[in-house]
Amino acid sequence: MLEKFISFLKENDWKIEENGTECDVYSNEVLSAYEPLPAAFLEFIQKFKSVISGDEKRFFFCVDDYSGESGLAFKWNEFELISLEAANGDEDWTNDIRSWWKTKIPFYMSVDGEYSFYAIDMDDNGSILSGYEPEFEEADKVADSFEDFMSKVLSGDIVL
């Protein structure tokens, strides 16, 4: 499935750089907090160093992005940070935001017009959520797993 997914992205002008070295995902402080990660997602982030659309407005996060070492302009938790800023110090709202994001791991971000993301919901057996600005936390389930997500992208049910 992963190879078909990557072929599809390449055919649609995505720039993909493979990771030349084996990496221990769980040595990454951010990723280790979500252990165990779904196998298909783990394979994806271990295999690739960067996966970015041709216009550079949409991208999948890879291991270096979660550690802040990739040089990407946006942080992996950018939308959580935006929400926290919007909470403007309101303690209850801030706690709600942090609680919601604690079990969600964003793996895709779009800054093409409306900001949006896809994330793995660790509270729901690794299902995939889709969220948009301005209320990122009002996300909807769009796939049962990362593998299902890739399948839906290939079939056109999910458009990146």
What are the language-model segments listed below?
Residues 51, 159-160:
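Generic macromolecular interface patches on structured domains
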Residues 117, 130-159:
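Glycine-rich, aromatic-bearing surface loops/beta-hairpins
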Residues 1-112:
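A surface-exposed partner-binding patch
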Residues 102, 122-127:
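Short, solvent-exposed coil/turn segments at beta-strand boundaries
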Residues 18, 63, 119-122, 130:
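Surface-exposed beta-strand edges and flanking loops
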Residues 112-118:
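Short, surface-exposed coil-to-beta transition loops
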Residues 108-110, 121-123, 133:
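Structured loops at beta-to-helix junctions and adjacent beta-edge loops in soluble globular domains
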